[in-house]
Amino acid sequence: MSQLALQMSSLGVEGEGIWLALGTIGMLLGMLYFIADGLDVQDPRQKEFYVITILIPAIAAASYLSMFFGFGLTEVSLANGRVVDVYWARYADWLFTTPLLLLDIGLLAGASQRDIGALVGIDAFMIVTGLVATLTKVVVARYAFWTISTISMVFLLYYLVAVFGEAVSDADEDTRSTFNALRNIILVTWAIYPVAWLVGTEGLALTGLYGETLLFMVLDLVAKVGFGFILLRSRAIMGGGSEPTPSAQETAAD
């Protein structure tokens, strides 16, 4: 990573712009890989997963490119006199890409439209309150909305584990295994985001914008490209999966 940073610096890209450039490249490469991988896909269900999963890094690439050129950046002057550089385009990205991630894992789990819709609604509330926490100038209000957003995230993750976990319980072993891997990616990466906000420039300012941008880039690549790679290369999507586990009702009927 440090070698890449040095090479980017030699091209005139410095500071957090290095990580924004690498984030753009990473998302574009992920998108192109998913497109190439899905060119010969004919099955309607597989196509649905490919379309959703391709859109995720495509949107993220546009967001990272806008931040790289400074279009997705603004300054917020806090009431205590501190000026914070805010990449609002990051929240625009999340407002579109996180529902698509939840749609992907919801369709994989076989969750109902109602449950997927409920989780997407919670997700949208989480992102919007997080954006309010970032843009408001009153310091106490920032932490209040951060707390609301974080509580929403905890409820979202619980809903994902409990409700989607129940929906996938009767699926075949390959589907359950893929679901568990994707669920764990969401649990780990999403849980780090509010912590990164809190210790970063938008919160306590324990880290600078350079390190904060690097952390968000790594999280985004894992949560989007890594997620998509595991999903689209799984036997649960590409076929050849094992037989579903009989439900309790089916077992009783036998």
Swiss-Prot record:
Gene Ontology biological process terms from the UniProt entry: phototransduction; proton transmembrane transport
Positions carrying N6-(retinylidene)lysine: 224
Gene3D superfamilies in alphabetical order: Rhodopsin 7-helix transmembrane proteins
Pfam family, any one: Bac_rhodopsin
Natural source organism: Haloquadratum walsbyi (strain DSM 16790 / HBSQ001)
Gene from which the chain derives: bop1
Family as reported in the entry's similarity comment: Belongs to the archaeal/bacterial/fungal opsin family.
Effect of residue 149 to A: Large spectral blue shift, but no effect on pumping activity
Protein name per UniProt: Bacteriorhodopsin-I
Additional free-text comment from the UniProt record: Different protein aggregation states can be observed, leading to variations in the absorbance maxima.
Cross-referenced PROSITE patterns: BACTERIAL_OPSIN_1, BACTERIAL_OPSIN_RET
PTM annotation (Pyrrolidone carboxylic acid): residues: 7
Keyword terms of this UniProt record: Cell membrane, Chromophore, Hydrogen ion transport, Ion transport, Membrane, Photoreceptor protein, Pyrrolidone carboxylic acid, Receptor, Retinal protein, Sensory transduction, Transmembrane, Transmembrane helix, Transport
Subcellular location field: Cell membrane
Residues marked Primary proton acceptor (site): 93
PTM note: The covalent binding of retinal to the apoprotein, bacterioopsin, generates bacteriorhodopsin.
InterPro entries, alphabetized: Arc/bac/fun_rhodopsins, Rhodopsin_retinal_BS
Keyword check for Aminoacyl-tRNA synthetase: no
Record field: transmembrane: 16-36, 51-71, 91-111, 116-136, 144-164, 185-205, 212-232
PANTHER family cross-referenced by the UniProt entry: BACTERIORHODOPSIN _OPSIN, NOPA (EUROFUNG), PTHR28286
Proregion span(s): 1-6
Any GO molecular function: photoreceptor activity
